[in-house]
Amino acid sequence: MIHSDKKHYVVFGTLALLIVLLVVANLFLGSVNIPAQEVLRILSGEEAEKASWTFIVWESRFPQCITALLCGAALSASGLMLQTVFSNPLADSSILGISSGASLGVALVMLAGGGTITTGVFTLSGFFSVILGAFLGAVAVLVLVLFLSSLIKSNVMLLIAGIMIGYITSSLISLLNFFATAEGVHSYMVWGMGNFGGVSLEQLPAFSLLTVVGLLVAVMLIKPLNALLLGPRYAENLGVNIRRVRNFLLLATGLLTAVTTSF
């Protein structure tokens, strides 16, 4: 047992060190050669020798670095939660069609809604409308998957159903592209080619806040998810409210998938 714990510490320590090294490499290395001492001066808030270097570090490398870290944490956490609930190591947001659902929500906003979400009470536009559309699309597919999981006992069949949902949403997106305007299709295609550099320094606080909220919910679910590893009946005997856990998982996974997809 002690040997196993030491092994885990070594693995986690190695991964943590690797993350730190990659963060440093991302900040100090790039297509533009910026001296290391200049990068340190920029990060400490001092004036750099060239104004363009300050722009590159703060507007490109730093947001890109934080976005990559948070996206990795969000996708791994959502995948772990789905694998635990469905008792299947292959379950994740892409295979179950949740990412496709988020993309469909964005397509409805950008291609059918003109980039805005309007109700009788409020109107959302810009990247906040994209986030809401992605969240609603991801949650809708996740609700459908959870409903199917109560009917389908085979995990393999459930994964196949998730793949089918993904193809259906992709077909609907293609249909929306066919009837949309050229400007709408262009905007959606540019968004669909997203990269870690798509989050600007101004958008980074909102992206970080939403991701951290989803991760905090995932942390709150650690104990009930550990109980679910032993089976739903055992978890219920331990006092775990499975329906409530699934609802929180629904919100956390939907939020994390929506944020990583929409930005």
Task: Give residue ranges: language-model regions.
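Alpha-helical transmembrane segments in inner-membrane proteins
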Residues: 1-263
